[in-house]
From Swiss-Prot:
Protein name: Sodium-coupled neutral amino acid symporter 2
Keywords, comma-separated and alphabetical: Amino-acid transport, Cell membrane, Disulfide bond, Glycoprotein, Ion transport, Membrane, Sodium, Sodium transport, Symport, Transmembrane, Transmembrane helix, Transport
Function: Symporter that cotransports neutral amino acids and sodium ions from the extracellular to the intracellular side of the cell membrane. The transport is pH-sensitive, Li(+)-intolerant, electrogenic, driven by the Na(+) electrochemical gradient and cotransports of neutral amino acids and sodium ions with a stoichiometry of 1:1.
Lineage, opening ranks: Eukaryota, Metazoa, Chordata, Craniata, Vertebrata
Segments in the Extracellular topological domain: 98-103, 179-189, 240-287, 346-366, 430-431, 491-501
Activity control, per UniProt: Inhibited by N-methyl-D-glucamine. Inhibited by choline. Allosteric regulation of sodium ions binding by pH.
Amino acid sequence: MSSAEMGKFDISPDEDSSSYSSNSNDFSYPYPTKPAAMKSHYADMDPENQNFLLDSNVGKKKYETQYHPGTTSFGMSVFNLSNAIVGSGILGLSYAMANTGIALFVILLLVVSILSLYSVHLLLKTANEGGSLLYEQLGMKAFGMPGKLAASGSITMQNIGAMSSYLFIVKYELPLVIKTFMNIEENAGHWYLNGDYLVLLVSVILILPLSLLKNLGYLGYTSGFSLLCMVFFLIVVIWKMFQIPCPMESDIINATLINATLAPFADENITISDACKPEYFIFNSQTVYAVPILTFSFVCHPAILPIYEELKSRSRKRMMNVSYVSFFAMFLMYLLAALFGYLTFYGRVESELLHTYSAFLGADILLLIVRLAVLMAVTLTVPVVIFPIRSSVTQLLWAGKEFSWWRHCSITVVLLAFTNVLVIFVPTIRDIFGFIGASAAAMLIFILPSAFYIKLVKKEPMKSVQKIGAALFFLSGILVMTGCMTLIILDWIHTDASDGH
């Protein structure tokens, strides 16, 4: 895309849009909009100086000004939005299915995808009525500084969660790659096989120098490369399902021992076949992580408005069609990845699917290629995620100040150090998916779009079907966030108590 700056904005009303209401104040915050990891589409700009903000034209009932016309085709917009949706969450979907069952997982996946689409609808309509294509600015117009802080904080948390999940992948996968290259069968205690040390090394040697750049020229390439990596990952997951036998050797050994010691009269085949029997409905202590993992996987909302801005022949209906195609494609991709991963390992799936293969296959050339591709993608993407967080902090604390290398470097080092501490001390990637999915993702999908819609869309009364639907959506978001967070914290407490014994 040739330009990231919008001067003024004019949207011709589509079928379901009417008059535009504008607040009485003008806002001109040069606030950058960047999606989360693997979710950015602006390769030729300085992220520190982006400005998607629209200048309000107060006093007119209809929001009419000049605007930068979109130049991105429908197909490329679908590709960009697919980039914004897909991410590391795909690695945790098989784990979610293993703890919900196939049928319950499909129901939850369908519900979350539909609700996410409804959220996109609310967000686009609110942007039209509120006269802004910036998520944080909608919060400012709706609720003042608290609204802006809520939007900015949610996006920052989501980005930190995404960044942590990518470094978790480095922590999990890089030791396995080194073991394969060095032909080491067992972990002999070498420091270079310790994931914590490797995360620190990668962060200091590769990620930090890239993060200190003022402009990331490779931004667009990273986004496309990451999507290709995930498609390749899906193909390998499907292929390996037909190659890995069930029952596995470990299942046969365990079944033999159990029958020999506990039930010598039992039919051994029943125990072995149970390990390869799919479940359709499962409820256990880990089931609570399914909804946060799914919401984490479908968060793309900070990228919706920038993609809408660049869409050729822009209209809300056309952007919703882009969303339908993208969400349907990602729905199929997520479903296939989760299903074939689950049908390969059943109840033995770990919270990061790629790591599960190493426990059963050891050194495998195809998996090694997948690991290298994924590691390269996440390493190049972490600096992309740091940019919007750093810009957000700069705008909140030092708005209007001239660029300072000292401030630029200090914020970068603090962010990267904080994320490394999380990755080293948080036990599993499941906890990152769960906590961020239940908090920031729930805010971005459920709570904020509905709250902005209720506040900014003035032409519809509160008793209208649209406003009632938005209010129910808001309440469901509160319920999802509080319920999942409560159950996750209780699971953490129970796990700590069990470990203490």
